[in-house]
């Protein structure tokens, strides 16, 4: 039976690797009674290379670090002004399939942007969310022990130039776009507050409990 309470952890700006390892630790040590959590964070500039990633898609990283990680998908960029959301959910307990989870995440972004009269959409063959063939949100998950970690990255108000140093998600010439220039949410906080609402509703959570920072381990 699904626990209808979702714990939201607001992490501020944090180093990618420390949050990644904390996600792994939470997933590896959780049990059937552990609460589902949503981590809201921004990262300093970093390229992350997923398990399907190919080195030739990293064109010119320059001084931005490249980290090989254990999520699905290929290379992407994280940086200040981008909303990153990590759903740490027991999908086995809630009986949500992986494809259904991906669809819910994409739809939550589409629904949130629709509040700003932005016509966004998903693509069956290329996970993420798009507006006029430009990508506004990237998606990469990992499922371990029936539980999800990693998640989504929504471009809000950031420097998009580093995306030109890679083939985003393995697609050469893929153009990125962000909420601010589309007339969407203007800050990461605003985007996060709105996305929490749409995502929790789609996933069936009825009570949200907010926390600042990670739980003491």
Swiss-Prot record:
A Pfam family: LplA-B_cat
Substrates-to-products reaction catalysed: octanoyl-[ACP] + L-lysyl-[protein] = N(6)-octanoyl-L-lysyl-[protein] + holo-[ACP] + H(+)
Gene3D superfamilies from the UniProt entry: Bira Bifunctional Protein, Domain 2
Domain BPL/LPL catalytic positions: 32-207
Locations listed in the record: Cytoplasm
Main location: cytoplasm
Keywords, alphabetical: Acyltransferase, Cytoplasm, Transferase
Presence of the UniProt keyword Acyltransferase in the record: yes
Example of a GO biological process term: protein modification process
Site description Lowers pKa of active site Cys, residues in chain: 135
Note: In the reaction, the free carboxyl group of octanoic acid is attached via an amide linkage to the epsilon-amino group of a specific lysine residue of lipoyl domains of lipoate-dependent enzymes.
Database matches in HAMAP family: LipB
Protein name: Octanoyltransferase
Organism for this UniProt entry: Shewanella sp. (strain MR-4)
Gene: lipB
């Amino acid at each position: 039976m699904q626990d209808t309470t979702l714990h939201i952890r607001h992490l501020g700006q944090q180093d990618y690797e420390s949050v990644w390892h904390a996600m792994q630790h939470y997933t590896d040590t959780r049990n059937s009674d552990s609460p589902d959590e949503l981590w809201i964070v921004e990262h300093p500039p970093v390229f992350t290379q997923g398990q399907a990633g190919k080195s030739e898609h990293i064109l010119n990283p320059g001084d931005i670090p490249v980290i090989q990680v254990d999520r699905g998908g290929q290379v992407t960029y994280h940086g200040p002004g981008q909303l990153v959301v990590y759903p740490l959910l027991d999908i086995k307990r809630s009986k949500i399939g992986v494809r259904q989870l991906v669809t819910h995440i994409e739809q939550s972004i589409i629904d949130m942007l629709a509040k700003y009269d932005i016509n966004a959409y998903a693509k069956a063959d290329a996970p993420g969310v798009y507006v006029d063939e430009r990508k506004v949100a990237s998606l990469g998950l990992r499922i371990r022990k029936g539980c999800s970690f990693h998640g989504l990255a929504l471009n809000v108000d950031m420097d998009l130039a580093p995306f030109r140093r890679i083939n985003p998600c393995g697609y050469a010439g893929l153009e990125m776009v962000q909420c601010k220039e589309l007339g969407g949410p203007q800050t990461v906080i605003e985007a996060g507050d709105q996305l929490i609402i749409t995502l929790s509703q789609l996933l069936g959570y009825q009570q949200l409990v907010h926390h600042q920072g990670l739980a003491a381990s």
